[in-house]
Amino acid sequence: MYARSTTIRGNPGSLDDAIAYVRDEVWPAVQDMDGCTGLSMMCDRETGRCIVTSAWADREAMQASAERVHPMRRHLVDRFGADDDLEVREWEVAVLHRGHPAGDGACARVTWSRGDPGRADQLLDMYRTSLLPRIQEMPGFCSCSLLIDREDGRAVGTVVLDGRDHLEQTREQARLLREEGVRIMGIDVLDVAEMDLVLAHLRVPETV
């Protein structure tokens, strides 16, 4: 399974318009494309950062959709009042585990990291055996995912929790897990963000 993420930064005051556009126009169009297995959208209402991720059954389906998705992305940038500092990345969905569906008010903690590309499988095994069992024990746990780029060693891990209170409750626990990942897995943590999960239409099967 594969995923394409689009990260933009725009005017926080236009965020509701951007959410409505993705919900009412982008998602209906994307879900009819061959191989699409879902779409999610996360937002930081303070900074205006917004991440839209589409999921695909295989690499071929993801790449075949690129030309049709491009004008929607351009329209989203214009509608959101975003600058041209957008980032589009393609990922392998390495880990996906659900505890229960995310409801209204769900939030996500997103961690970007980089490791040795040559040790990708070893790092994934460490994540599954060492970190995942403790992540799913966090209060309010809904789901977690790990997307990887095997070529450059980048990864993005997302933990979805029931609400903002649970984000605050687990902040220290998450910090300790990141430190353990740095120590045991030898990864570099590039960025961490706490965001609202505003759309979650995912039919991606679990990998755990």
Residue ranges and their predicted role:
Residues 1-50, 57-208:
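Short S/T/G/P-rich N-terminal loop/turn motif that feeds into the first structured element of a domain
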